[in-house]
Amino acid sequence: MAVKASGRFVPPSAFAAGTGKAFTGAYAWNAPREAVGRERPLTRDEMRQVQGVLSTINRLPYFLRSLFTSRYDYIRRNKSPVHGFYFLTSTFQRRLWPRIERVNQRHEMNTDASLLFLAERDHYARLPGMNDKELKKFAARISSQLFMMYEELSDAWVDAHGEKESLFTDEAQAHLYGHVAGAARAFNISPLYWKKYRKGQMTTRQAYSAIARLFNDEWWTHQLKGQRMRWHEALLIAVGEVNKDRSPYASNHAIRDVRARRQANLEFLKSCDLENRETGERIDLISKVMGSISNPEIRRMELMNTIAGIERYAAAEGDVGMFITLTAPSKYHPTRQVGKGESKTVQLNHGWNDEAFNPKDAQRYLCRIWSLMRTAFKDNDLQAYGLRVVEPHHDGTPHWHMMLFCNPRQRNQIIEIMRRYALKEDGDERGAARNRFQAKHLNRGGAAGYIAKYISKNIDGYALDGQLDNDTGRPLKDTAAAVTAWASTWRIPQFKTVGLPTMGAYRELRKLPHGVSIADEFDERVEAARAAADSGDFALYISAQGGANVPRDCQTVRVARSPSDDVNEYEEEVERVVGIYAPHLGARHIHITRTTDWRIVPKVPVVEPLTLKSGIAAPRSPVNNCGKLTGGDTSLPAPTPSEHAAAVLNLVDDGVIEWNDTEVVRALRGALKHDLRTPNRQQRNGSPLKPHEIAPSARLTRSERLQITRIRVDLGQNGIRPQRWELEALARGATVNYEGVNFRYPVNDEWPGFN
């Protein structure tokens, strides 16, 4: 029988306080699972949209196509087809595709300059994804078409003026240059001397040099490779692959490309020597290169010595220092950062989409406003000098750091002028006053340490161990490779002095023998500059050259140049540095610093002598099947067809036999057949990149070439732009149909037998 308790009971203990975390279960088997549900399939309309966007992606270059297709496949597999649909329609189609289109529009063929290469428009649009082999073929086609155009124009000029000598005038060459160079401008290049042509100052010699470049396949290959690299990088910037979250400063492809080119250049330098033209003496080329400012370590030390010298000179003159930062407007930045501290995120800047500016455009903007500032300094009799450093933001947009010194009474006025021009364009946008222009006063003795970090970051990352980049949060030592790749890709000079004597004269003075005076040859002013450069005291060098902001013609020492004995591949004289001269003593009074004439030659291959470490070995079996040569049975090897043909030609030269002898014809035919490689008719090349060889058409006669010019003009009046093969067919008498209208022109035959 149960005992019934009465009275009060002790209440149970309180529940444990919650941790705020979701229940996960004590074991794996009772952990919460996602609800079982069926994913929503795409509708028919959504499937059509997906197929349309994928077809657009498939038309992109491979490096972009693979990027988007792999990202779409990853989202579709790991999330759902609906998420993949949102990625294609929202992220790509609405946000990224307009940026890609705008970049391609900025780099497409300039048909306003010329319509000659209209047939190559689609091929030129594939340039950012073009391989080297296809690019070289494309360059060869461009140069050959320009050469044919030049020949046709030359023949037309001779027919109009009567004599061939009329071609060798400034007027004729300027006329030919205008047409050929104008057609070349369709590929977004600026031909040499184009500005002089527009001003009417073109000479025959200048026209020859410029046109020779336009006929050179290698010159076009170099131009197209540069465009391909910048177009490729601009597309990666547009799709957000260059920023602090992906690859800061430059894309991974650009970093690899620059590293590969530098490695190839290094291997070339290792394979060459410097040879004395007179004595034949040879020295290692790579050792001389690594001992010059081409070595990043030496270049960094020279810059640091220059900064320290500028600071000492400013202290001696009583000038004060400023640290200026100039940044381009927001429309030059492809991305923007949102948030603060570690929570900062990168977002696309839609204000960039209208113009799609690249880093080179931002650099041109900064150079333009700096030229306006310098003009204002000159108008107000203000002087500043120092050093300029260009470095990129995390998205590749450049900004300037300037270490300037000036008179204390002029500092406020200089800062106000710079601020006014820095904010002249879009100065009312949000954050412009704070971010577009910054000016800090430098304490005496702290300038070198303040800017040293920027120099190391832009060269080799020296002494930056443990320091982090403000833009990316990554170690500064690791960002040096990306910054140098950025500068190489966009052809942006990173360092430049402002208002200081030339560095070329400083380096030439340091080439002179140590401690040897040149006062007897020049005067004490020149000797003071030599002694300052010899000791590496850049402050004394500035003073010896006349001080800061001195025009070059008024400096004490300048670099002397002289035309070289050799000409380049375009038959131009090449000026080379030979020494120094003092303008106040006359330009003809030159001191030669480069007395030896060197040339770059390949290294002589080292041939190791044949070493026989063993004597005659015993035969592997008692039977010797080798025959023994005797004196009477020795037979000479039969001559090859080439050797036989050479012997026959010697007999012809000696007058023993005649050219029309059947033996001569038979010998030459045999030599030619022997040297030619016999093609295998049973095998065909199935590669689409290697088209089958097509026999070239017959050469056009002179009358047919003249007929082509008349046909092109006649068709142009009807609004027709014919291709090259159509013009040749019409000149030979064929009939060509253009939009239902047949065109045929009479043939001017030069063969009287066919009349």
Descriptions of predicted regions:
Residues 403-407:
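Short hydrophobic/aromatic beta-strand micro-patches
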Residues 1-396, 408-755:
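Right-hand nucleic-acid polymerase module
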